[in-house]
């Protein structure tokens, strides 16, 4: 620690001595800034640039020597796991001697692959991350936060001005709080808190000069805007009455006027200087991002600093200017392996490859090992390699294997179903898809003597009722994208998909119920296939047509 202090530049050392802390970075822009506060802000930006440059150099070195870096990451995971646990006991009860496996090849030969569901059930291994954790840990999470902030500042220089950012959810899109000695910069980054989303939204509404809007995930932000429309008058009355804070009757009038004009472009009407929306990418968020871009956040850029899974940060976003997420798989902890996925293959690949061995255009399932639960865990997240950064792959996330539909062996993958649903909604006049989830008919016992089928629950804007003709279009689109499904439908082995329109707030209630579950985890993935009857029945009770 003393060595680190000696290496810090004088600028950062002076910053640590300044009082008061940089809470002023998040004060409203109309607050009077003292000379000292202005100096603190400039120095905070300088310290952030230094820290990000330091992490960028580390990333360059690690990606130039990916094999060596992955070896070091594995050694760290083994050393950290050995401290509290001792020998690792697998799902079969067998004790695996992996702590002596100091090289990646020996480690992979000693420890078998297991699926995420098995990893969570291990008696001694525990879960990949504690379910109560609201932020990720490891070198990748720190890199994602520092490099993401630097990229955001470069692309949108005015975002990090005092009062320029507001987070409207209790969770943060930044994977990790800044550690000492950068803890004084925490107010640049939103950190999880106990505030209710309604209180956070009200705080943001009181600040018309916002430049960036933060939310834990896109689905959480979707719920925030849905709640804003439902409770807009209540929020306007609170602002006009000064509950909390000073009364802002003119701002309350602006809120009412903005809501009267409908959802499209609402964010820019409320915050005319808004430039970017920051959310954390995780499973099942693509649909929510598309809905936000088309409606409430129309005209705004979206940025995710990282892709997070249950084992931690697995991808870094170094390219905020790209509309669709491209993520670098870093060679540090957690230790990442890639399991080849072949389309139509009857048997799974027998062995994994390391990051430097990934081939462009190929698809792989992510396999993670971290110190919290020392398992070679198959996450089920499938990525496609689209490029390279030094010796490490740049990927896009394609689908989650655990979100496939399968009632007769047809195996409709998440991305295939999403394509079919998108085609169908495009044929429903005036409709915009907000959310969806599917249930296999056996879960709800809804076959009643007919062939097994899918129950599909959708939330829409612009369409209040679904005709039978529109409902049938989804089944036709499924047959277009999946020849196997078409064959089963022709033989009558699978019945037509049944589409149900649910009321406003149904998916918000679903996410709240999932978050309250003891096994919930961070980041909060959005399930597109529901496996539990009581969860599916919650949506079923909200069906409108």
Segments from the language model and where they lie:
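Active-site diphosphate/adenylate-binding microenvironment
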Residues: 70-121, 127-132, 139-143, 147-158, ...
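Active-site glycine/GP-rich loop and adjacent strand/helix microenvironment
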Residues: 2-88, 93-95, 99, 107, ...
